[in-house]
A protein has these predicted regions:
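Hydrophobic alpha-helical membrane-insertion signals
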Residues: 4-53
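Acyl-donor binding region in acyl/amide transferases
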Residues: 82-164, 169, 285-361
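Acyltransferase donor/substrate-recognition loop-hinge adjacent to the catalytic core
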Residues: 4, 150-230
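Conserved GNAT-fold acetyl-CoA-binding loop/helix
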Residues: 26-46, 226-242, 272, 282-283
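Active-site proximal loops enriched in glycine and acidic residues that flank catalytic Cys/His/Asp
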Residues: 233, 259-260, 268-274, 311-316, ...
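Phosphate-binding active sites in nucleotide-utilizing proteins
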Residues: 218-272
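Conserved donor-binding loop and adjoining core beta-sheet/short helix segment
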Residues: 36-149, 249, 259-277, 298-304, ...
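C-terminal "cap" of GNAT-fold acetyltransferases
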Residues: 174-190, 371-398
């Protein structure tokens, strides 16, 4: 059998191999949505990824002989650790063949790099914080993921768990069928809230003042999510970069702000689920100088019949005011008018029991679970752990 090695990414060719690794390993999986290669290169570029203005990443490739069999990114996020008083390192962009030795070597390489920065645990997957794509799919592998949600083969959770990782948090996706008019319970709750608080108004995001509107959403997001597990505030640069990324797919009727006496107190953001259109592009907008992928994506986007409700946030002092039913009722009505058959609500923290009760009362059903794992670095880097020969060195850097 060919020798298994893990090495850090240093050259342009290695960076290309790192990006292409996921496409090579998952191209036969019909449920995988190939991200645009342009976006994947930008994710690793300090000029295009605001996270890298304060965070650090180290990329690793696993080879068996000359064949790339896996990859991982070690992620150091000083803002997260300052916010939580922790010493957590992270891993992301994990992709690996079903090879336990390769996975173990990748995790040990990432862990060793983070240990050099005084981190004590390895948490993930996150790309590169909880504000972005995160979690390992642990069920429903036969269904494609929604827009901006991850997908992985069934082997991934096994590879992670067999390296000593344990679950630290689950993130759930729920499905909400779109029907003519909001569900009766939601309709009654929204009507009661409107009667009780006549000063609540729900409006669409004004795209002509997009930057100012996104600044309002950012403030609401930070206030509403500040006590959530894993939350870390986004910098102004990060949020504006995300807002620019979302702008081309934003539908104003599904992007809502709730105000009380003219002051924003809540928001909800629902996007068309363009994952099927992205699959048609195959990871490239252009081939041989011709916009074939773009044309296929635009054609498929006209057939979209699902959306993803990706965020709802309410400032604490208005959580009992009935503003959430008003936002959801407006969203349900707009989604039905757009011809949507269902919305995926994702993700919802596994410890958010009040949200579970609300979703069940609306007739939603839980569809997918994404898991965040954690491992102590002392256990991961234990010299007595068999299998990879990394007892004397963090990784083979040849």
């Amino acid at each position: 059998m060919d020798v298994l090695t893990v090495s850090p990414v240093r050259t342009r060719a290695q960076r290309t191999a790192f990006v292409e690794c996921e496409y090579a390993l998952r191209r036969e999986d019909r449920c995988w949505t190939p991200p645009l290669r342009r976006d994947q290169y930008r994710l690793l570029d300090r000029a295009h990824n605001a996270f890298l203005s304060f965070g650090e990443i180290e990329l690793y490739l696993a080879h068996r002989g000359r064949e790339v069999v896996g990859r991982i990114a070690a992620v150091y996020d000083p803002r997260f650790n300052h916010h939580h008083g922790a010493r957590d390192g992270f891993f992301g962009l994990f992709a690996c063949v079903d090879d336990q030795d390769a996975a173990r070597m990748l995790f040990r390489a990432a862990g060793a790099w983070l240990a050099e920065r005084s981190m004590t645990s390895l948490v993930g997957p996150v790309n590169f914080s909880m504000n972005y794509e995160c979690g390992t799919l642990i069920d429903r592998f036969d269904e494609p993921a929604a827009l901006l949600m991850p997908w992985n083969p069934p082997s991934d959770p096994k590879l992670i768990e067999n390296c000593g990782f344990t679950a630290v948090q689950d993130l759930h996706a729920w499905e909400w069928e779109c029907t003519p008019g909001p569900p009766a319970l939601l309709d009654r709750a929204a009507a009661a809230a409107a009667a009780r608080r006549g000063d609540i108004t729900i409006r669409s995001v004004d795209l002509s003042r997009y930057e100012a509107e996104m600044d309002r959403v950012r403030e609401l997001y930070h206030h509403a999510w500040q006590d959530n597990w894993g939350f870390v505030p986004m910098t102004d640069h990060e949020f504006r970069q995300l807002a620019l990324r979302l702008r081309p797919v934003l539908r104003p009727e599904l992007s809502l702000i709730a105000e009380v006496d003219g002051e924003p107190v809540a928001f909800s953001l629902t996007l068309p689920n363009l994952a099927p259109a992205l699959r048609m592009a195959g990871g490239r907008l252009h081939r041989w100088g011709v916009p074939l992928g773009l044309a296929r994506m635009l054609r498929e986007s006209r057939k979209v019949r699902q959306g993803r409700l990706m965020a709802v946030g309410v400032v604490e002092e208005h959580r009992q005011s009935g503003v959430v039913p008003l936002l959801l009722a407006r969203t349900a009505d707009a989604a039905h008018r757009l011809g949507y058959e269902a919305l995926e609500i994702s993700w919802v923290l596994g410890n958010n029991k009040p949200a579970f009760r609300t979703l069940r009362s609306l007739g939603c059903r839980r569809t997918k679970t994404y898991r965040i794992y954690r491992c102590d670095l002392l256990d991961l880097l234990d010299p007595g752990d068999p299998g990879t020969g990394l007892a004397d060195r963090p990784c083979d850097t040849t």
